[in-house]
Amino acid sequence: MTIYPAIDIKGGRCVRLTQGRAEQETIYAQNPADVAMQFRAAGSEWVHVVDLDGAFAGEPQNLAAVQAIVAVGMKVQFGGGLRTRAAVERALALGVSRVVLGTRAAESESFVGELVQAFGDKIAVGIDAKNGKVAVKGWVATADLSTLVLARRMDTLGVATLIHTDIGTDGMLTGPNLAAQEALCSAVKSRVIASGGVSRRDDVVNLAKLAQRHANLDGVIVGKALYERRVELADLLSLAAAS
């Protein structure tokens, strides 16, 4: 199981939001690339980067910061405002290893299919769940679509990786929604990366146990717990490598 430490960028800075609310923002670092260097020093191969301004605006707003993170030498999984093919191509041209589609994936299966045909496993889809429905446009709106229905559609299109975020637990440090993660893993063959709620080492232990039952549970994104020093990245990486 892969650990993906998270960097959320807003106004060029590293921040965390609570349940995606722009007004509940905590600034953790002025330079996101410095944070990426710390993650790399701890032994992380991957970093999960979200352009929050891009998610709200509908197109990436912090590509210079993303490029600086790529230059650190990590594999970057990047999302936030990638709603056109041109935006996806710009991100990949920066050296991003995997892009995450969100809003547009819920709106257009043909768009996803076209990108999967062109870029293969560099395309991931973020499935952001709010009470079982898909949240879109920076989580400020909800589509009339269940998360499991969208997941199955993406699986059928050949999307290699699904990133499943439970918004109710995101940034709350209350523990992940294991039942929701298990339900999604059971519904698809795609790799699943769990996101939302990790607050302590045992949360990752429990996800690793879930991954033993569901081989497609491929990773977990850890954000606020790292910044609040509830967990140590090097410890989580060792735990994941042993599971």
Curated annotation (Swiss-Prot):
UniProt EC number: 5.3.1.16
Cell location: Cytoplasm
Coiled-coil segments: none
Key words, A-Z: Amino-acid biosynthesis, Cytoplasm, Histidine biosynthesis, Isomerase
Biological pathway: Amino-acid biosynthesis; L-histidine biosynthesis; L-histidine from 5-phospho-alpha-D-ribose 1-diphosphate: step 4/9
A biological-process GO annotation: L-histidine biosynthetic process
One Pfam match: His_biosynth
UniProt keyword Chloroplast present: no
CDD domains: HisA
GO molecular function: 1-(5-phosphoribosyl)-5-[(5-phosphoribosylamino)methylideneamino]imidazole-4-carboxamide isomerase activity
Keyword Cytoplasm appears in the UniProt entry: yes
GO cellular component: cytoplasm
Catalyzed reactions: 1-(5-phospho-beta-D-ribosyl)-5-[(5-phospho-beta-D-ribosylamino)methylideneamino]imidazole-4-carboxamide = 5-[(5-phospho-1-deoxy-D-ribulos-1-ylimino)methylamino]-1-(5-phospho-beta-D-ribosyl)imidazole-4-carboxamide
Domain of life: Bacteria
Homology family: Belongs to the HisA/HisF family.
Family annotation (HAMAP family): HisA (MF_01014)
Protein name (Swiss-Prot/TrEMBL): 1-(5-phosphoribosyl)-5-[(5-phosphoribosylamino)methylideneamino] imidazole-4-carboxamide isomerase
Species whose genome carries this gene: Opitutus terrae (strain DSM 11246 / JCM 15787 / PB90-1)
